Amino acid sequence: MDRLKSVSPNDNGVWLGSESCSLDEFRTMVERKATAADYPLADSIQRNVPIYDAAKIEKAANDCDSIARYMAEWHRIFLNGPGALVFRGMIRDAALIDAVGAALKEIIAEERLVTGGKGDHFAKAGANARVWNSHEKLCMRAPELYARYAANECVDLVSRSWLGPLYQITCQVNVVYPGGMAQVPHRDYHMGFQDEAQLRQYPATVHRLSAALTLQGGISHSDMSIESGPTKLLPYSQTYLAGYFAALRPEFRSYFEEHYVQLPLAKGDGLFFSPALFHAAGTNSTADVERFVNLLQIGSGYGRSIEIVDRARMTKHVYPTALTMQEEGRLTPRELELLVAATAEGYPFPCNLDIDSPLSGMAPPSQQDIMRQAMSERWPSGRLNEAIDAYQARRTSH
């Protein structure tokens, strides 16, 4: 039961809603200027985004004091600064990045023969090509290439600067063809995948926390002129607490389109930014350039429970008892909802995006969704078991 769908944003700011959004307040937060004094270790600041020379970072990698200063500066950028940074020349081995790109394009071609194309969370299908879970797929196809590509000093350091150690890397290829239109501006995973009714369920502290659980990034596999549509960014927008609501509102999207910045990127450059930063892939207005990025979504190692609990097993076992108790009036509707929340898996991620494509929505159904539907429609136990087993079967990468 979504008891907070209509909650008012009050109680000393514990609860947020679209009513919490103020474009004037937003402007005061994002219309700032990053300076060399703010980020003295940056080699330059372009369009409000600090730029770093990856070769310098690698040379300093064994100097603990220097690296600690770099990492502290990057953390401040993501926390309350511009929200994005660029590593120039993050992969300088042209043969390596070309070979990895060729392997990923082979995967695209093979998957297209099977699926006909992948969905996208924030753009129309057909405007681009996707490889979900390119991290694992590259590893399995070309382990030596993967080993050289994945062993990247800048990726490790910037990940630890925001998430600490024990981070988890996932990658998703995005190739945008000539004429491919821009995405709508958005925030990203986790809360960027939720609608307003869902966002209202979470206190403001969790709105802050969401961005601390993930770091977004991308490795450029092609030279990207502005005309090819590199990622549009709105510096400092990650600092706006009500931003997950604001990103859904037309006046904020209009403001984004009037004030975003883009940076040209060279093949081998790396871009990293807060998932709460308002951003969107740009329009590829070229006639012949395929914009090719391997996106990185790097997650905190803390995003897990302490114990392994077989919730599918529990759901199937308790369901016939719960159904009988429901029919006999021994469980109220509210008690049934509490039982579902205590028993079944409520979060549908991580998932296999090759199977649970965003063409069918921002998020696939969870175990709780299945259990709720089963209780509502009085499914026989066999049908519930089949649905849960099918759900579990989709929870594999291959």
Could you say what each language-model-derived stretch is?
Residues M1-N80, L339-P350, P358-H398:
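Fe(II)/2-oxoglutarate
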Residues L295, Y302-S381:
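C-terminal hydrophobic structural anchor segments
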